Structures are given as C-alpha cells and as structure tokens.
C-alpha cells in the first residue's frame, strides 16, 4: 500500500493527545499533521463533508492553537479535517518528543 501523505502524521496513543474543542463539543485527537487533524467522532451532529470546521487545539503544555479547516471525511468513528491554517512544524516536533519521552518512561 502506497502512502500518499505529504506531511508527517503523529498518531496519539489512547487519551494522550491534546484536547480539541469546537462549538462546545470536546473531541479526542487521534492524530495531527501540519495540514490535517483526525478526531474521534463520538458526535458528528452538524458536520458534513465539505463543511467548514473551526476550534481550539490545547496541548498538554497549555499551548492553544486555533484550527480552521474543511471536513474531508466522516466515518462512524472519525472525522478528518484538512486545515486551511497549518499547525506549525515546531508544535508537531514538540509533541513527537513528548510522546517519545512519555512512552520511554513506561517501557
């Protein structure tokens, strides 16, 4: 299977990702990249493919990043968002280091 993604995607182990809040609804963050975010879809009410999506992504260090994008895919379990404003690479790299350190301690 060919991986056609243009950007590194950081997958989060269960319950270790940042918090995403949109329209008063909190979503579990499954993975992030500079150009996209995948959320757990416990609620897709009001979402449609092609629709605009905005919210705040709050990382465990307290940094908050405002997210703007378009809903690209909705499944029974996930919502995929293509971002119109990229997440800075420095944030992705810091999160990658945090995940590595967190799980090295557990091993």
For the regions a language model picked out, list residue spans one by one.
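N-terminal helix initiation/capping motif
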Residues: 1-34, 40-42, 96-107
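Short conserved beta-strand and strand-loop elements enriched in small hydrophobics
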Residues: 15-20, 50-64
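Short acidic/polar mixed-charge low-complexity motifs
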Residues: 23-26, 61-65, 77
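Short beta-strand-centered aromatic/proline hotspots
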Residues: 26-29, 66-72
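Generic beta-strand structural signal
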Residues: 32, 73-76
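Short, solvent-exposed secondary-structure boundary/capping segments
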Residues: 37-41, 75-86
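Short, conserved charged micro-motifs
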Residues: 46-50, 89-91
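C-terminal output/interaction extensions
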Residues: 79-107
